[in-house]
């Protein structure tokens, strides 16, 4: 799993050939925290 920012998003996601799963996460987001074990 990668942690991306504005500088690396285009290179790692938009320019990658193939499929990419992007998970948007926010600190303190209860549904986000509930999904983490499954996504990771």
UniProtKB/Swiss-Prot annotation:
Keywords: Disulfide bond, Electron transport, Redox-active center, Transport. SUPFAM superfamilies: Thioredoxin-like. Disulfide bonds join 29-32. InterPro entries: Thioredoxin-like_sf, Thioredoxin_CS, Thioredoxin_domain. Pfam families: Thioredoxin. Transmembrane segments: none annotated. The keyword Protein biosynthesis does not apply. Participates in various redox reactions through the reversible oxidation of its active center dithiol to a disulfide and catalyzes dithiol-disulfide exchange reactions. Belongs to the thioredoxin family. This is Thioredoxin. It comes from Clostridium sporogenes. The lineage of its organism: Bacteria, Bacillati, Bacillota, Clostridia, Eubacteriales.
């Amino acid at each position: 799993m990668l942690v991306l920012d504005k500088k690396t998003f285009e290179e790692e996601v938009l320019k990658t050939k193939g499929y990419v799963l992007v998970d948007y996460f926010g600190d303190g987001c209860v549904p986000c925290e509930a999904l983490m074990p499954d996504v990771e």
